[in-house]
Design a protein with these regions (language model features):
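Active-site phosphate-binding/coordination module
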Residues: 26-123
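Short helix N-cap motif at coil->helix boundaries in the Bergerat
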Residues: 22
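Non-catalytic pre-domain segments flanking phosphatase-related domains
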Residues: 1-14, 37
Length: 123
């Protein structure tokens, strides 16, 4: 039987809102210190529902380099070059069907499109 190789690839994916930052959009000294300590040993990336501009802003504040994940994981942006590395979106046809179902069911929904967020709230 073949031996399994030990995998030495580790990384940390962290949420932005409610984890790295609170409502005031401030990163505490404790969080900055902890992220810096971790990023000296393993790759650290932000994963957020926000757009590329925000993920780049906060990755810069945390001195994170490499891929960062935004728009609920549909887009990958390089923190160094600021270039979009990959985008995986739902087709327009399927998106339209989903939105029609939300409207028909009178459910609340949040849609991110082209870096803008649209919310249909009952409030």
């Amino acid at each position: 039987m073949q031996k399994l190789k030990k995998i030495n690839n580790y990384g940390l994916l962290v949420d932005l809102d409610g984890t790295i930052i609170q409502n005031d959009e401030f990163i505490s000294t404790r969080v900055k210190r902890s992220v810096k300590k971790l990023s000296n040993h393993i790759p650290v990336s932000i994963v957020t529902g926000r757009g590329p501009q925000d993920v780049l802003k906060f990755s810069k504040l945390l001195n994170l380099y490499g891929p960062q994940y935004c728009e609920n994981g549909t887009s990958v942006v390089d923190a160094t070059s600021k270039k979009i590395l990959d985008v995986s979106l739902i087709s327009d046809d399927i998106s339209s069907k989903i939105i029609k179902e939300f409207i028909y069911s009178e459910m609340e929904y949040l849609v991110v499109s082209d870096g803008k967020t649209y919310i249909n709230s009952k409030e």
